[in-house]
């Protein structure tokens, strides 16, 4: 019998997604299962989960838990897919909204409920894992509750916890009086996770978990420095942080079988990519041109993603002949910026303020270049998907971008993309210009570069093996 892993998170594909966390939680269990582990997953039952999945759910049990002065309902639904049990913690008061995340005291209460419900669900369903694998601040209180209130129970006495930091910037700050009222924590525990007169859920996960990981080797180093540590670098320097690179689901993201594309292609049969480019230009109202490179951005529109650099860079890229496609939602200032650019340059710039998976795949497939100049990037999945679909990434050397994109060397004809070091509009422009000039000036070299990028293997098998090794090490200790 393999190791039993209980993976707890706030989102998971294909059920609900706002970012890369969902992709990881959706793909890692299957990769671990292939290596012999027994994996189950728990997320909240959001009202936004599509009806097609809600119809699959089987009601397992329901009960009440004490949360502050209230008894709160906990329902448990289950979907069994490809040998993995996906559980959904149900409470309509907390999760029947038209959003996944919010802010303020209600957000704190939602995930306090979810944290306590997760441990109670394991008890009620007799799930006794070897490892509870937790993800980001929404689950950070679980290892604290486990140690303070559940560790004396026989079923939890030997359980180990792994806490993965997907993005250190979002830490889950809560009112101490509210947290104490909801979870009845002792003053010592509250003092341990105090953060400038707040309670910090990310800090709780880091302190109380048996092992802490993050999603790339470079990001693991960066968050231990004041520049990237989001004021927790001092704490992180006293923990061993394992940097395990995220992967992508190669079966789910495959340009040879992707039904969202008008034509299939692969590194050995790349002809269909040009058809995808032509279809994208037509669909978005861009000038039909094989010679003009299409540069794409698919991103949350926030300052983390380096979007302020584009203000100075985009006019120069258009002067070089590039077309620009942007897909994403976020801060109003960036939505206005890209909407204005598209209105002024309708044959060269297209902007869609939406989250559309099918369109994203069509953009990856139709783009020649993928721009990702992040201020910081814990891992990044977009550059991996871009390479998978033959779009050459132009990235800043930070976090997982530095770990996954090999800079192009025109003398040795090696590399899988273009990169720049400093957070600078000039450096972004120069790296983008190098990509555009290679595309326009040396088609043979570009085709070889594209083939290398598409051949790069960022599947989950290697990363799952690293997680499994960590789990086994924890269990033996």
What kind of feature is each model-predicted range?
Residues 1-477:
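Catalytic cores of nucleotide-sugar-dependent glycosyltransferases that transfer UDP/GDP/TDP-activated
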């Amino acid at each position: 019998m393999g190791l039993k892993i209980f993976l707890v998170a706030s989102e998971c594909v294909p059920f609900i997604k706002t970012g890369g966390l969902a992709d990881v939680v959706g793909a890692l269990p299957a990769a671990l299962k292939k290596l012999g582990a027994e994996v189950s997953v728990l997320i909240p039952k959001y009202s936004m989960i599509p009806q097609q999945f809600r119809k699959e759910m089987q009601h397992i049990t329901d009960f009440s838990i004490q949360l502050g002065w209230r008894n709160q309902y906990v329902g448990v639904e289950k979907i069994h897919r490809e040998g993995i049990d996906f559980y959904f913690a149900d409470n309509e008061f907390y999760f029947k909204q038209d959003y996944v995340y919010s802010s303020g005291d209600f957000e704190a209460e939602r995930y306090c409920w979810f944290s306590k419900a997760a441990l109670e669900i394991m008890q009620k369903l007799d799930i006794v894992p070897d490892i509870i694998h937790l993800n980001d601040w929404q689950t950070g209180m679980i290892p604290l509750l486990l140690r303070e209130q559940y560790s004396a129970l026989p079923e939890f006495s030997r359980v180990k916890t792994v806490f993965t930091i997907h993005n250190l910037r979002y830490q889950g700050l809560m009112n101490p009086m509210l947290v104490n009222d909801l979870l009845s924590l002792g003053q010592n525990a509250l003092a341990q996770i105090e953060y400038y007169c707040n309670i910090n859920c990310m800090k709780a996960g880091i302190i109380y978990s048996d092992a802490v990981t993050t999603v790339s080797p470079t990001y693991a180093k960066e968050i231990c420095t004041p520049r990237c540590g989001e004021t927790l670098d001092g704490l992180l320097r006293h923990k061993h942080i394992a940097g395990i690179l995220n992967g992508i689901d190669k079966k789910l993201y495959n340009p040879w079988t992707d039904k969202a594309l008008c034509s299939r292609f692969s590194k050995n049969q790349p002809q269909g990519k040009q058809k995808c480019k032509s279809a994208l230009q037509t669909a978005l109202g861009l000038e039909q041109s094989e010679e003009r490179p299409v540069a794409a951005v698919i991103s949350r529109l926030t300052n983390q993603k380096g979007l302020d650099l584009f203000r100075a860079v985009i006019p120069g890229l258009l002067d070089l002949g590039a077309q620009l496609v942007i897909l994403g939602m976020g801060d109003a200032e960036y939505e206005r910026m890209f909407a204005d650019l598209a209105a002024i340059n309708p044959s060269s710039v297209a902007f869609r303020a939406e989250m559309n998976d099918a369109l994203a795949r069509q953009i990856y497939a139709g783009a020649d270049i993928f721009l990702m100049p992040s201020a910081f990037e814990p891992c990044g999945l977009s550059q991996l998907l871009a390479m998978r679909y033959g779009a050459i990434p132009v990235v800043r050397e930070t976090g997982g971008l530095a770990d996954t994109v090999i800079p192009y060397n025109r003398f040795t004809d090696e590399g899988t993309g273009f990169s720049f070091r400093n957070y600078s509009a000039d450096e972004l422009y120069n790296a983008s210009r190098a990509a555009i000039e290679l595309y326009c000036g040396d088609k043979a070299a570009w085709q070889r570069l594209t083939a290398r990028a598409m051949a790069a293997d960022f599947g989950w098998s290697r990363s799952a093996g690293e997680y499994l090794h960590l789990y086994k090490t924890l269990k033996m200790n």
